[in-house]
């Protein structure tokens, strides 16, 4: 298990935490997929090679054939010494992003979230570049940075509980298909496979793998069984 924590930005605020808290209230549908992604990230430790290169988990979730409801993690800083990433969630005409970096303490992986924002369609007012640069500066000064560790008001577990107070979010995250999607993701991580690896081995498209890991309820049980078989998991489903 990895740990999700929050780090204060240059305004001395746990801005990413506050953003997620507002997202739960104001955009619960988008928050649902974001939390599915965060819960998967918790199960995925980043592997660090002797060269210093990090093998980062790829989280790519899709719900529906149109791919209008999706989430993806991408690396926005490619240098070895700056492992800065972004989690992008897209729902209809809205696009929100969370910027974070990876840190290590012994064998523990920490995903440190600093900034959250909605992507502005106007390039002249969009804050993406300035937020990314700010997170890079926070990362470079991370030894001095104040984190949410030990602060019960800003723990990921606290935020998760707030999300589950929303019946719609709880209904999805605790559903059979979403739980199975998280399990498929964790087994793929254990095997150190990418989504493309799993797609090739299961003879399914990468889009279908993204939908399975998201727990898309519109997919058939047969597809879930097929992927579980490839992952070496015996899955028997029955209807009461």
Q: How would you describe each model-predicted region?
A:
Residues 182-201, 226:
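Short basic helix-loop element that most often maps to the first helix and adjoining turn
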């Amino acid at each position: 298990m990895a740990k999700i924590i929050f780090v204060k930005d240059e305004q001395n605020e746990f801005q990413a935490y506050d953003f997620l808290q507002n997202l739960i209230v104001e955009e619960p549908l988008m928050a649902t997929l974001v939390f599915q992604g965060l819960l998967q990230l918790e199960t995925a430790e980043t592997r660090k090679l002797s060269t210093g290169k990090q093998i980062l988990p790829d989280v790519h979730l899709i719900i529906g054939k149109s791919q209008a409801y999706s989430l993806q993690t991408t690396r926005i800083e490619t240098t070895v010494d700056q492992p800065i990433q972004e989690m992008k969630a897209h729902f209809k005409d809205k696009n929100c992003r969370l910027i974070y970096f990876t840190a290590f303490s012994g064998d523990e992986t920490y995903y440190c979230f600093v900034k959250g924002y909605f992507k502005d369609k106007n390039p002249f007012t969009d804050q993406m570049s300035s937020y990314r640069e700010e997170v890079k500066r926070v990362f470079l000064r991370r030894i001095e940075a104040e984190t949410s560790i030990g602060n019960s008001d800003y723990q990921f577990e606290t935020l998760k509980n707030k999300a589950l107070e929303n019946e719609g979010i709880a209904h999805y995250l605790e559903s059979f298909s979403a739980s199975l999607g998280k399990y498929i993701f964790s087994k793929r991580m254990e095997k150190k496979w990418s989504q493309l690896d799993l797609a090739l081995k299961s003879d399914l498209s990468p889009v279908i793998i993204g939908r399975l890991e998201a727990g898309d309820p519109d997919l058939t049980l047969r597809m879930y069984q097929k992927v579980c078989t490839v992952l070496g998991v015996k899955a028997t489903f029955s209807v009461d």
